């Protein structure tokens, strides 16, 4: 696969993160898309270099991505229980 494909997918996920800011779930899905594209890019680049120091990097990235997915699920469930929705507009800090 071409690394340009994963860079384009990262940019698409980044633009989704910038434009779709209404629901918390859509933001978390865009973050997961970004993490997946970075993981694929790291896996391909470590297979090209064939260096022993770059082999565990995709696994470390995958571990951080799983932790991020778990934390985002906890945040989504907590927000849904407290605010009864996942809209970003209900997270304003300036409510008086």
From Swiss-Prot:
Membrane topology classification: Multi-pass membrane protein
Please give one Gene Ontology molecular function term for this protein. NADH dehydrogenase (ubiquinone) activity
Q: Which UniProt keywords apply?
A: Electron transport, Membrane, Mitochondrion, NAD, Respiratory chain, Translocase, Transmembrane, Transmembrane helix, Transport, Ubiquinone
Task: Identify the main location.
Answer: mitochondrion
Task: Please indicate which superkingdom the organism of origin belongs to.
Answer: Eukaryota
Where in or outside the cell it occurs: the entry states: Mitochondrion membrane
Reported EC number(s) for this entry are: 7.1.1.2
Swiss-Prot/TrEMBL catalytic activity: a ubiquinone + NADH + 5 H(+)(in) = a ubiquinol + NAD(+) + 4 H(+)(out)
**Coiled coil residues, start to end:** none
Positions of transmembrane segments: 1-21, 24-44, 57-77
Enzyme class, first EC level, given as a word: translocase
Tell me the function of this protein.
Core subunit of the mitochondrial membrane respiratory chain NADH dehydrogenase (Complex I) which catalyzes electron transfer from NADH through the respiratory chain, using ubiquinone as an electron acceptor. Part of the enzyme membrane arm which is embedded in the lipid bilayer and involved in proton translocation.
Q: Member of which family?
A: Belongs to the complex I subunit 4L family.
- Can you say what this protein is called? NADH-ubiquinone oxidoreductase chain 4L
> Gene encoding this polypeptide?
MT-ND4L
């Amino acid at each position: 696969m071409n690394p340009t494909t994963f860079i384009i997918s990262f940019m698409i996920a980044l633009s989704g993160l910038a434009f779709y800011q209404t629901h918390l779930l859509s933001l978390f899905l865009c973050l997961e898309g970004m993490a997946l594209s970075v993981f694929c890019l790291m896996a391909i680049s470590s297979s090209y270099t064939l260096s022993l120091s770059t082999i565990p990097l995709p696994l470390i990235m995958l571990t951080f991505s799983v932790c991020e997915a778990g934390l985002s699920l906890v945040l989504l469930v907590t927000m849904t229980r407290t605010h009864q929705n996942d809209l970003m507009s209900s997270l304003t800090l300036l409510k008086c």
